[in-house]
Amino acid sequence: MRKIRANAIAILTVAWILGTFYYLWQDNRAHAASSSGRGAQRAGGRPEQLREDRTIPLIVTGTPSKGFDEKAYLSAKQLKPGEDPYRQHAFNQLESDKLSSDRPIRDTRHYSCPSLSYSSDLPATSVIITFHNEARSTLLRTVKSVLNRTPASLIQEIILVDDFSSDPEDCLLLTRIPKVKCLRNDKREGLIRSRVRGADVAGATVLTFLDSHCEVNVEWLQPMLQRVMEDHTRVVSPIIDVISLDNFAYLAASADLRGGFDWSLHFKWEQIPLEQKMTRTDPTKPIRTPVIAGGIFVIDKSWFNHLGKYDAQMDIWGGENFELSFRVWMCGGSLEIVPCSRVGHVFRKRHPYNFPEGNALTYIRNTKRTAEVWMDEYKQYYYEARPSAIGKAFGSVATRIEQRKKMDCKSFRWYLENVYPELTVPVKEVLPGVIKQGVNCLESQGQNTAGDLLLGMGICRGSAKSPPPAQAWLFSDHLIQQQGKCLAATSTLMSSPGSPVILQTCNPKEGKQKWRRKGSFIQHSVSGLCLETKPAQLVTSKCQTDAQAQQWQLLPHT
């Protein structure tokens, strides 16, 4: 009996020691994984408080297939030993091929996002993915991430538009996966026309456009569908996380960015303006954005069709995001980035495919069409920033201009003032000149007791090219200035004719200082009233073609 008891005690002791060792080993492994995750988060540069990373569960574990042989699909296009992994796709295909098509990724959303709830009757969407010679591993991972991380009821179909890839089976074999459909172009059409083709056959009321080298994150679709369901004129985009082109690490992007651009129509990510940051108390609220990157967004199909889809005369890729963004804002819609929606994207440093007319010429053609249709008089700044566009062919835009008129879209000036006031209008300075009426010239006439320059009319002296300082005016875009002071109306109301015109410290954003030439008139841009001479002062008055006091010569002409 003693022997049995001793053996039992020995067995229990060994079991306790082994159990303790296993517990400590597991605990240490969990802490190591957590530390590794936090390090990756900092590397991604996400400006949020530190928290434990969450690995996303798969909603569907292993996408059911109808005879789809994943191993055969991927192995058919694997790299040969010694082959450059960057050559064909401009990212490390070797690293992509190593990864599972169902790989887990980090939940990069703000910690408040999981607590949000969405409508139980969100509309289903057609996901449209266009590609040309995409790596099979990234294309498959894009498709499976959508199916694995989206409730099945929200995905009506995934439409793959194969833009004349070298191997038709890149697309066709994927149709063995449920909900996946394949359209193949019989010639190279480019992303823009391929997307239109996919949208035309889509059966859902909402369209979701994705690039072919993405991985969607947890609850990526629900917050975007919610915004579109609440207002069908919204076009919404996720925060676009970064998938490294070198090792395919999934890195969190900043939640404080929006889309912007310069006058050459070059897209850039920029910080949300400070005043918007100050009023932004809820990090889950959508961010207004002047433009979207264009690769990933959700739009109501009827709204997409109403707006005129894409400009089908644009070629291959580039510039279509500006054309769509201007059209949405100026024709009654809005653009948003939804912070609780995250999608990873492989950003490449070069295009892995050829443009029939070359990358630069294609981009010029597309952006020039955008400028000619949507930028009104501000298109001059596009040409100044991109002089290589001058004289380049861009096709007819008559139908696009007519469509804009039919939709009664707002002006580009409205867009700058209401959507993107942060885009500074370039100041185009010219040589000093005079503002002449008969034999008299507009001049500053000393200062008052407050130090303000006084305005009046005096006999012209000197010449237009070399006037005296008091009669020398600098004509810049919408500003008439002298010695750092600008001509300003005291009222911007059309109902206030007779308001005095004074000189103020120049402020390019001040509407009271905005003027334009209209024939021989100098017209106030905001009120529409005209500059007129009175015996003792200058005023703004209702424009009258027979009013000699409103007729001006600007020498030299700008």
From Swiss-Prot:
Residues 286-348 are annotated as: Catalytic subdomain B. It is a single-pass type II membrane protein. There are two conserved domains in the glycosyltransferase region: the N-terminal domain (domain A, also called GT1 motif), which is probably involved in manganese coordination and substrate binding and the C-terminal domain (domain B, also called Gal/GalNAc-T motif), which is probably involved in catalytic reaction and UDP-Gal binding. The ricin B-type lectin domain binds to GalNAc and contributes to the glycopeptide specificity. In the CNS, it is predominantly expressed in several distinct hypothalamic, thalamic and amygdaloid nuclei. The most abundant level of expression is in the paraventricular, ventromedial and arcuate nuclei of the hypothalamus, the anterodorsal and parafascicular nuclei of the thalamus and the central, basomedial and medial nuclei of the amygdala. Also expressed in cerebral cortex, lateral septum, habenula and hippocampus. Residues 428-555 form the Ricin B-type lectin domain. One of its GO terms (molecular function) is polypeptide N-acetylgalactosaminyltransferase activity. GO terms for biological process: protein O-linked glycosylation via serine; protein O-linked glycosylation via threonine. SUPFAM superfamilies: Nucleotide-diphospho-sugar transferases, Ricin B-like lectins. It catalyses: L-seryl-[protein] + UDP-N-acetyl-alpha-D-galactosamine = a 3-O-[N-acetyl-alpha-D-galactosaminyl]-L-seryl-[protein] + UDP + H(+); L-threonyl-[protein] + UDP-N-acetyl-alpha-D-galactosamine = a 3-O-[N-acetyl-alpha-D-galactosaminyl]-L-threonyl-[protein] + UDP + H(+). PANTHER family: N-ACETYLGALACTOSAMINYLTRANSFERASE, POLYPEPTIDE N-ACETYLGALACTOSAMINYLTRANSFERASE 16. Residues 1-6 are cytoplasmic. This is Polypeptide N-acetylgalactosaminyltransferase 16. Its EC number is 2.4.1.41. Residues 27-558 are lumenal. The lineage of its organism: Eukaryota, Metazoa, Chordata, Craniata, Vertebrata. Keywords: Disulfide bond, Glycosyltransferase, Golgi apparatus, Lectin, Manganese, Membrane, Metal-binding, Signal-anchor, Transferase, Transmembrane, Transmembrane helix. Mn(2+) binds at D211, H213, H345. Catalyzes the initial reaction in O-linked oligosaccharide biosynthesis, the transfer of an N-acetyl-D-galactosamine residue to a serine or threonine residue on the protein receptor. InterPro entries: GalNAc-T (IPR045885), Glyco_trans_2-like (IPR001173), Nucleotide-diphossugar_trans (IPR029044), Ricin_B-like_lectins (IPR035992), Ricin_B_lectin (IPR000772). Residues 34-46 have a biased composition (Low complexity). GO terms for cellular component: Golgi membrane.
